């Protein structure tokens, strides 16, 4: 799905979604929320957002309860996926992953590496 969003609805040369459908799901839909249809987006205040400060405003993604996240960046042609298990061994002890902002920090390292 994220590759299709990056490629405007195509995957490996085959069209699955129209460009208009991709844009419908990727564009912000509310004045009171940063979210698009089914996807999260960067927060206007970067330090409060779910993704890296350097992520362009066009990125869309999802952060899952178990700690995973995925982001589609059509501007740079990137898909970022981070897989983790924040619920083991204690499902409601979110100190590490959430407090330390591990997911956006790893994504930030990716953007910094791309600049080199």
Outline where the language-model segments fall.
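Catalytic loop of the DD-peptidase/beta-lactamase superfamily, centered on the K-T-G motif
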Residues: 2-116
């Amino acid at each position: 799905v994220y590759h299709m969003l990056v490629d405007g609805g195509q995957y490996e040369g085959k069209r699955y979604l129209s460009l208009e459908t991709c844009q419908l799901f990727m564009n912000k839909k509310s004045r009171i929320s940063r979210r698009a249809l089914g996807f999260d987006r960067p927060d206007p205040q970067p330090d409060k957002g779910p993704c890296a400060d350097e992520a362009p405003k066009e990125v869309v993604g999802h952060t899952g309860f178990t700690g995973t996240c995925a982001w589609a960046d059509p501007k740079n042609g990137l898909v970022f996926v981070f897989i983790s298990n924040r619920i083991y061994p204690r499902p409601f002890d979110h100190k590490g992953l959430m407090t330390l902002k591990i997911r956006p920090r790893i994504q930030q390292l990716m953007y910094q590496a791309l600049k080199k």
